[in-house]
A protein has these predicted regions:
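Small-residue-biased structural context
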Residues: 2-150
């Protein structure tokens, strides 16, 4: 019975990283790029729960690099699209994007190397940050791109 509850909880948590219709902006390429961001978050979640990997440092660095590179690519695409439609909220979007990239860039790699005992907690914190930021940004800002106020 306990295992059933545990897997149910895992399934509920897993839903947080699933790209569903509620995150769709109606702009196909943006939705596809958002799906990829969710996939990177899901990979991070899977890494957290992979008990066969003791030292996850290399994988953490790889995921951070993937996230940074793909996020920069996505933000560029999204901002170019907003420019092309003369989107009024472009400046606010650029500021939010820059703050997110700044957070990723300023992760202290030396601190990561020294955190053998805290890698699990670091990954949990990272996933929490990613999920919260991405969900709030898509629902609060990106969905407005396809429905600009008149």
């Amino acid at each position: 019975v306990n295992k059933e509850n545990e897997s149910s909880t895992d399934a509920d948590v897993k839903k947080l990283f699933t790209f569903t219709d509620k995150y769709k902006t109606g702009i196909e390429f943006i939705d596809e790029e958002h799906k990829r961001l969710f996939e990177i978050i899901d990979e991070t979640y899977e890494l957290i729960h992979d008990n066969f990997i003791h030292d996850k440092y290399d994988q953490i660095i790889s995921l951070l690099d993937q996230l940074k590179d793909y996020t920069e690519f996505h933000f560029h695409d999204e901002e170019e699209y907003m420019k092309s439609i003369h989107y009024q909220g472009l400046e606010a979007q650029q500021q939010a994007h820059a703050a997110f990239i700044d957070k990723l860039v300023n992760i202290d790699i030396h601190e990561l190397e020294a955190m053998d005992d805290n890698q699990q907690q670091y990954l949990l914190d990272l996933v929490n940050f990613l999920v919260t930021w991405l969900a709030n940004h898509i629902l609060g800002a990106d969905k407005k791109i396809s429905k600009p106020e008149a």
